[in-house]
């Protein structure tokens, strides 16, 4: 079977949200090539730094390759993508360009392995693609096995990596978790690795829920994490110790009141996906409902916040 490859050029602000959009329009796979990757180090199977090939990356901004089977492809999909991007009110979209061509199935399948390798995302977590073995774990480190491109959250973007750093710092064994907008399931997997339970992973997109379940299975935690479709915290009644929310700022803003009501005393909200321009608005709302700000992290124009519901 052949595939239609749509190549998109986008600005960095759009990158954290593009994979979910492409899932919603039925993409079979996504490869994201970020020009900033050339500035980062990576680790191979035995821990050594390896060199990225500049020819594999755009000189600026972000190149996204999205794949559809020829049987499923409809030319209207580009208009669908544009409409969903237009609906992202908090994102400054300065570049959105498209081109298409047909590729052989074997070429498409190999794209994943050319662009995603094991890397250490924080002190305790190493992200490992499912086709690679990794023997370099040190004491206290945990491997998170993922397939990239199917839902947002490979740990490589600032929003996800900051969440992981806050999780490893504050989440404790035996704490109950709800993960709002789970995407790839990476944050739930990290919490499980630290001994948290029970864990519930929610996502409005049923495709993302399936992706998360696949990744839970890869990490031997499918039975330990309850994954299901969910619209933020609507309908949730069981109190939790920690809530994760790596989603857009205006969506975070919508769920702050519900999150406070759902947390146990001394419970923690860990949230990211917030652009710096929205930081003050989110912090003011958090404080307004009673949260105490525990920590604020910033990276590449993005903000992550840990906020506690004091007893």
Swiss-Prot record:
CDD domains: AdoMet_MTases. S-adenosyl-L-methionine binds at residues 160, 181, 203, 246. InterPro entries: Ribosomal_L11_MeTrfase_PrmA, Ribosomal_PrmA_MeTrfase, SAM-dependent_MTases_sf. Its EC number is 2.1.1.-. It comes from the Bacteria. The keyword Methyltransferase applies. GO terms for molecular function: protein-lysine N-methyltransferase activity. It catalyses: L-lysyl-[protein] + 3 S-adenosyl-L-methionine = N(6),N(6),N(6)-trimethyl-L-lysyl-[protein] + 3 S-adenosyl-L-homocysteine + 3 H(+). GO terms for cellular component: cytoplasm. Keywords: Cytoplasm, Methyltransferase, S-adenosyl-L-methionine, Transferase. One of its GO terms (biological process) is methylation. It is found in: Cytoplasm. Belongs to the methyltransferase superfamily. PrmA family. Methylates ribosomal protein L11. NCBIfam families: prmA (TIGR00406). This is Ribosomal protein L11 methyltransferase.
């Amino acid at each position: 079977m052949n595939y239609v490859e749509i190549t998109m050029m986008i600005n960095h602000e759009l990158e954290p949200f593009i994979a979910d959009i492409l899932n919603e329009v039925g993409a079979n796979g996504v490869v994201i090539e970020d020009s900033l990757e050339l500035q980062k180090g990576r680790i191979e199977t035995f821990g050594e730094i390896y060199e990225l090939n500049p020819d594999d990356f755009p000189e600026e901004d972000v190149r996204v390759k999205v794949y559809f089977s020829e049987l499923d492809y409809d030319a209207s999909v580009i208009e669908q993508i544009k409409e969903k991007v237009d609906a992202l009110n908090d994102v400054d979209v300065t570049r959105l360009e498209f081109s298409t061509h047909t590729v052989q199935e074997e070429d498409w399948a190999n794209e994943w392995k050319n662009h995603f390798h094991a890397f250490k995302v924080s002190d305790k977590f190493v992200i490992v693609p499912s086709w690679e073995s990794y023997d370099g774990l040190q004491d206290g480190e945990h491997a998170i096995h993922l397939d990239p491109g199917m839902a947002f959250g490979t740990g490589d973007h600032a929003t996800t990596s900051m969440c992981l750093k806050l999780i490893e710092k504050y989440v404790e064994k035996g704490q109950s978790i709800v993960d709002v907008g789970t995407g790839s399931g990476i944050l739930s997997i990290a919490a499980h690795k630290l001994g948290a339970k029970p864990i519930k992973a929610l996502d409005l997109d049923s495709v993302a829920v399936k992706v998360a379940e696949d990744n839970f299975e890869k990490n031997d935690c499918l039975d330990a994490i309850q994954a299901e479709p969910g619209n933020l915290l609507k309908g949730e009644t069981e109190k939790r110790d920690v809530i994760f929310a790596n989603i857009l700022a205006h969506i975070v803003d919508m769920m702050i009141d519900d999150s406070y009501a759902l947390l146990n005393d001394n419970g923690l909200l860990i949230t990211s996906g917030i652009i710096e321009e929205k930081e003050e608005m989110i912090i003011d709302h958090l404080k307004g409902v009673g949260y105490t700000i525990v920590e604020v992290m910033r990276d590449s124009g993005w903000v992550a916040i840990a906020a506690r519901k004091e007893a």
